Amino acid sequence: QCDRRQRQMCIRDSLKDIGKLASSLGYKAVQIPTWDKRIFDLDKAGSSKDYCDEVKGILKEQGLEISELSTHLQGQLVASHPAYDLMFDVFAPENLHGNVKERTKWAIEQMNNAINASNHLGISPMASFSGALLFHTFYPWPQRPTGLVEEGFKELAKRWKPILNHADSKGVDICYEIHPGEDLHDGVTFERFLKATNNHSRAKILYDPSHFVLQQLDYLQFIDFYKDYIKMFHVKDAEFNPTGKAGVYGGYLDWKDRPGRFRSPGDGQVDFKSIFSKLSQYDFEGWAVLEWECCIKSPEQGAK
């Protein structure tokens, strides 16, 4: 549903319209989500370079490039714990709801189509989520059985290695957004995944400092540690203001009431000047992609 202030944003439901808006606001590229056929037909893009050239042409008319493709929702469904199956069903076609085996198969096919599409578009980095087999156990109570974490990452790697291998054959890097709710949610878990995949050369990082603010991780030192793996960058701000009632876990509060919440760039606590300095220092060659989820301002304000 769109209220008055959002209506002008909501009616832009075609790639051409979105491109016009982005160009008018000074953007140079767009990151395309791959789960909405009104914008991008992933099945067609995976099999047809002509279709991909057509999409590039639509945006080129507006003076825009495609920065990357996003496969967050499909990646999430590559690995899902049963505790989340009902909530994650909405990411898949309705005919797959309640059928985890077929849903997972669909997600893997989608990932491979997106890899093919990225190759057709001439784009190396591709955004995704790792999915989560273990995240429900991140707090050690009840105590985790010995070996559970190792087995979990072994299974996660088993699911992703064929996809990573396909990505390698197409010259595509899968950039996992390090994100709460995913098994890859900090540097330690990314390293666990790397080890489980035998340091697969196509396993990379989508760096988003907002998620590190919310879990109180040093987002600047993270760049020092993982500079060689960071191939994508989301510009998203956040703030963390703990109280005597709630902290990192948030107390099940709505976003606007949580101690940790996303904000528009400049309204939060992220030191973007230092981030851009570090990324430049390490010769980061990717795009700075605005991702907006502010709980206070409107989408139109965020786009501007």
Segments (PLM) and residue ranges:
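Short, acidic/polar
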Residues: 12-22, 55, 105-117, 214-225, ...
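Active-site acidic/histidine proton-transfer and metal-coordination neighborhood
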Residues: 16-17, 21, 61, 78-204
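Acidic/histidine-rich catalytic cores of soluble enzymes
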Residues: 17-19, 29-30, 69, 149-269
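Short beta-strand segments at enzyme active-site cores
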Residues: 30-32, 66-71, 123-131, 173-177, ...
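Glycine-rich, proline-tolerant flexible connector loops at the mouths of alpha/beta enzymes
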Residues: 33-60, 75, 130-138
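Active-site-proximal loop/turn and secondary-structure-junction residues that shape catalytic pockets
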Residues: 34-38, 71-75, 130-134, 178-182, ...
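C-terminal helical cap(s) of enzyme catalytic domains, especially alpha/beta-barrels
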Residues: 299-304
